[in-house]
Amino acid sequence: MIHKLTSEERKTRLEGLPHWTAVPGRDAIQRSLRFADFNEAFGFMTRIAIKAQEMNHHPEWFNVYNRVDITLSTHDAHGLTERDIALAQFIDHVCAHTEPAA
């Protein structure tokens, strides 16, 4: 079984993810990104999808043109786990090298 983060673990782990916010009413985190255009957004999503498949941990996301909204939570644990933290860290790493639009 996958270990759901305790309140203290969650607080500590989220300190290292300043671009992510808690989802109201859910044990989940989210981040919104904007890119130069649809191709940039879709390319970003493709990179994340490949990693998510390797991890067997898939984000909830929404895309319209240059915008990508990502929500992370582990369904099997009914909340936030280390898998979500690891995927969020990977997403942040990709963003740091992709330069999303302001």
Swiss-Prot record:
EC number: 4.2.1.96
Keyword Lyase part of the UniProt annotation: yes
Molecular functions (GO terms): 4-alpha-hydroxytetrahydrobiopterin dehydratase activity
Keywords tagged on the record: Lyase
Entry-linked InterPro entries: PCD_sf, Pterin_deHydtase
Reactions that this protein is recorded to catalyse: (4aS,6R)-4a-hydroxy-L-erythro-5,6,7,8-tetrahydrobiopterin = (6R)-L-erythro-6,7-dihydrobiopterin + H2O
GO annotation terms (biological process): tetrahydrobiopterin biosynthetic process
Pfam families membership: Pterin_4a (PF01329)
Presence of the UniProt keyword Lyase in the record: yes
Family per similarity comment: Belongs to the pterin-4-alpha-carbinolamine dehydratase family.
PANTHER family per the UniProt record, alphabetical: PTERIN-4-ALPHA-CARBINOLAMINE DEHYDRATASE
Protein name as catalogued: Putative pterin-4-alpha-carbinolamine dehydratase
Organism listed in the record: Burkholderia ambifaria (strain MC40-6)
Lineage: Bacteria, Pseudomonadati, Pseudomonadota, Betaproteobacteria, Burkholderiales
